[in-house]
Amino acid sequence: MRGKQALKNMVASLLLQVIVLLSGLILPRFILEAYGSSVNGMITSVNQFLTYLGLAEAGVGTATVVALYTPLALKQTEEVNSILSATRKFYNKSGMLFLALTLVLIGVYPFFISGQLENSLVRWMILVLAGSTLVDYFFLGKYRVLLTANQEGYVVALIQAAGTIVNMVVSIFLIYIGAGVLFVKAVATGVYMLRLVLVKIYVKRKYPVLDFYAEPNEGALKQKNAALLHQVVGIIVNNTDTTVLTICLGAKSLLEVSVYGIYMMVVNAVNQLMTSFSNGLTAGFGEVIAKNEEETLKKSYSSYEYMYFVIMFIVIACMGVLILPFVGVYTINLTDVQYVRPVLGILFTLIVFMQNVRIPGLTIICAAGHYKETRYQAILEAVINITVSLGLVWKFGMAGVLLGTVCSYGYRSFEIVFYTSRHLVKGCAKKSMFRILRNVFTVAILCTVGTYVIPQEITSFTTWFLYAIGMGLTSVFFVVVINYVVEPDEFMQLRHRVNDIIKK
């Protein structure tokens, strides 16, 4: 049952990420050509600042998912209701705080970009972009955490996938007929809000005994402060770059943020793709840990890590070779700022590697609820990021900021590998490091050869796509073969596990 639910979640999440990836690649290009790099940079920057304000969520969602694992597994309906009631109260408080912080941002943000765009456009854009988060706090959040904890995240994923398609089609149509950027984003926010109705209908039918107004058990969310700390760190680490660029680069800040946003569009697409292979598994691992099935955990984790690393290094090999040609084609008609920068291509590829190599271990840490135990490591990650970024931005610009991100991700990712080995999946670090090193060596060779074989200046998406297919097939062949030769038993076990899940 766990395997089948995990497969459903993984497939639905993968579908969502593919759709989000396509939308994330297509829409910004229309926005760039219709409204220019400064507007695109402003939208990117505002979204990052709103992510900071998302700290108002205070770790409630993460803590709720962890708290629900055991009562859902043991079918303790009253306990589930009391936890969800407490979650509803916390989400309502978070929504009010987020609204207040948004109003503050509306007042101060225009001063950061003074003279680059009209203040009225910027202020209204902040309010429009904040709308979807407000809906999440006041209405959708409590349903989403329940479905995630009960291994039904695929429901939310499928509904969101449909909404993303509708949003993309409607937005492109509005841009095509000459609508203003503010109206386009307002309609997009409206489409996002509609998914609330579908999620609510599903939950009401599937869980008729739920009571979000039962006696709240706020003590069950004791992990929320520790989860909040990790959330704070995650937001700082993931959004420091845009914030530093916006504040420190003066009159050219929005143009540089636009360049950053195009590369991050690729990074986010890759990260979303990789996330689809872990999203559906956290709840399953949480159930295994809750039931103390140590041997099952060890075997399942090894298979998961093996599969994840194979996929991850295939993707990184392709990204390392193809990111610069892609950016060149994507921005071929834009002349207001230089987008193709080889150093950025290398640094963003390193960032993707450092971000994703931690995911298998992080999945287990989240499933076990080890937020308090890992808080100091998380704080150090944020300190490294901010310190190095601010120290290098004045001399090296965007490259200096990215070096700060590489350093912080590098420290934290490998610390997670060893923490998982010490406390959760005993003794797994040696195997993990061996897998990482052999795949890094393989990918380094693939990237070196690939950059000589594939032209780094391409003028059409068709040509780029054909080269991408060739690079993809080559990477799949070499990475899969090398991992099969080195660990044939793990390969066969993974294949049998997938076959068993599909047959069920």
Segments (PLM) and residue ranges:
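Helix-terminus/linker motif at the lipid-water interface of multi-pass membrane proteins
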Residues: L22-N40, F111-S114, I175-I177, I236-A269, ...
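N-terminal membrane topogenesis motif
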Residues: M1-G24, E78-S85, V122, Q151, ...
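Transmembrane helical elements of multi-pass membrane transporters/channels
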Residues: K8-L25, G163, V184-V199, V203, ...
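Interfacial/gating helices of multi-pass transporter permease domains
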Residues: I31-L55, I83, V122, V181-V184, ...
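Helix-loop junctions and terminal segments of transmembrane helices
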Residues: R29, A58-L74, T148-A149, Y207, ...
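Membrane-proximal transmembrane or re-entrant/amphipathic helices at the cytosolic face
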Residues: G427, T451-K504
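Interhelical loop/hinge segments that connect adjacent transmembrane helices in multipass membrane
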Residues: M1-A6, L182, V197-N239, T243, ...
